[in-house]
């Protein structure tokens, strides 16, 4: 599977579906979620909350609202908003997002840094966990993962793990 690293906004990449590193309640109050909700509309959060609770290690698909994508995958890295995350939760969330994207037969999924914002997971730890899960995954439909973040340190961490730096 092709892995590409991009510095920029997840809302502007060319992908079929984007991932929101969520909480189990589906509330979109911090980090990447705020941007997705602001640009895509309240209906994204409404639908995620209706599908809650979303345990860490699972994921749900909602509308992308006004965004150009076919949907938003909400993959919790924490149970409650602003709760600390962990390397294991980042792994579970990444795996759950990939599994759902593949099950829905999307070709390209964009994933931001998982658990690195309010979750507090060090970027290098999250980058390694995410890349290892992506490399282990055996897709049926999924062809490409775009790792995208506005944070230069996150981008550098992915590039380092992938041997691009």
Swiss-Prot record:
SUPFAM superfamilies referenced in this protein's UniProt entry, alphabetically: Macro domain-like (SSF52949)
Segments forming domain Macro? 1-165
Question: What InterPro entries does UniProt report for this protein, alphabetically?
Answer: Macro_dom, Macro_dom-like
From what superkingdom does this record's organism come? Answer: Bacteria
Q: Note the Pfam families from the entry.
A: Macro
NCBIfam families given in the database record: PRK00431.2-2
- Please identify the protein, giving its name as recorded: Uncharacterized protein aq_987
């Amino acid at each position: 599977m092709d892995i590409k690293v991009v510095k920029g906004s997840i809302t502007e990449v060319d992908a079929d579906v984007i991932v929101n590193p969520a909480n189990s309640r589906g509330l979109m109050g911090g980090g990447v979620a705020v941007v997705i909700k602001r640009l895509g509309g309240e209906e994204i959060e409404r639908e995620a909350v209706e599908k809650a609770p979303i345990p860490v290690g699972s994921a749900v698909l909602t509308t992308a609202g006004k965004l150009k994508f076919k949907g938003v995958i909400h993959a919790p890295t924490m149970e409650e908003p602003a709760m600390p995350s962990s390397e294991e939760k980042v792994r579970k969330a990444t795996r759950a997002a990939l599994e759902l994207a593949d099950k829905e037969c999307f070709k390209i999924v964009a994933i931001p840094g998982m658990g690195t914002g309010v979750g507090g997971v060090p970027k290098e730890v999250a980058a390694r966990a995410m890349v290892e899960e992506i490399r282990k995954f055996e897709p049926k439909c999924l062809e490409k993962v775009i790792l995208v973040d506005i944070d230069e340190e996150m981008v550098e961490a992915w590039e380092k793990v992938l041997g691009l730096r």
